[in-house]
Amino acid sequence: MHIDLNSDLGESLGAWRMGDDAAMLGIVTSANVACGFHAGDAAGILATLRGAKERGVAVGAHVAYRDLAGFGRRNMDVASADLVADVIYQIGALQGLATAAGTRVTYVKPHGALYNTIARDARQARDVIAAIRAIDASLALVVLAGSPLERWAADAGLRVVAEAFADRAYTPQGTLVSRREPGAVLHDAGEVARRMLQLVREGTVRAIDGSTTRVRADSICVHGDSPGAVDMARAVRGALEREGIALRPFA
């Protein structure tokens, strides 16, 4: 039995620091590296890529809407031609930096509002899929587990990686509880570790109403930019390893 742990990295911008990339690279098996549209600068991104190379961590393009001011968390109605070009641009930029760092980009994980939108918006989903196919159809696409995007991407011939979130609550229907709702974000590292162990071993999680819901995931996202993020990620990894579950990248 095995699972991947991923985290969003390379998001520091100039004097503004975000997360502890060095620590997280010692925990995760895949790094979703910012591409400069929602966060990250070239020098910082390159440093993160070099760290990933040294640690044997897989690299993915964390593509986003063009939204530095909103950290990529604002919904945008982007024209198809623009969205396709923006995604191609971001992947290409990261591929260049990855080559310089001695590694390569093996997957794409959209960020923030783009991630949430394409999970259910067919038009923008098609645009992102088209962009990936245009630049490198071998790249895997990380998607929200159980979302329509799983089927859309698979039907388009992409390799699909279903993702669960370690620190997020789930509805009885297996979807994420909105961040606007109380209890949507979990902060107890021990609880989070136990939940992820259940997810990997049984394919289920305890929903916010106390029921059990099914979630099939190939990768678990452990956020690196929240308070206590490193300790939580370590707790998740430790719990899995103690139960003999191997941690390895999906790509």
From Swiss-Prot:
Q: Which Pfam families match?
A: LamB_YcsF
Stored Gene3D superfamilies: Glycoside hydrolase/deacetylase
Query: EC number(s) of the enzyme?
Result: 3.5.2.9
Top EC class for this record: hydrolase
| GO process annotations (BP) | carbohydrate metabolic process
Q: Catalytic activity annotated for this protein?
A: 5-oxo-L-proline + ATP + 2 H2O = L-glutamate + ADP + phosphate + H(+)
Task: Give the residue spans that cross the bilayer.
Answer: none
- Where would one find the signal peptide in this protein? none
Record-linked CDD domains = LamB_YcsF_like
GO molecular function annotations of the record: 5-oxoprolinase (ATP-hydrolyzing) activity; ATP binding
Q: Which UniProt keywords apply?
A: ATP-binding, Hydrolase, Nucleotide-binding
What does the annotation say about its assembly with partners? Answer: Forms a complex composed of PxpA, PxpB and PxpC.
What does this protein do, in the record's words? Catalyzes the cleavage of 5-oxoproline to form L-glutamate coupled to the hydrolysis of ATP to ADP and inorganic phosphate.
Similarity section: Belongs to the LamB/PxpA family.
Protein known as: 5-oxoprolinase subunit A
Point out the gene that encodes the protein. pxpA
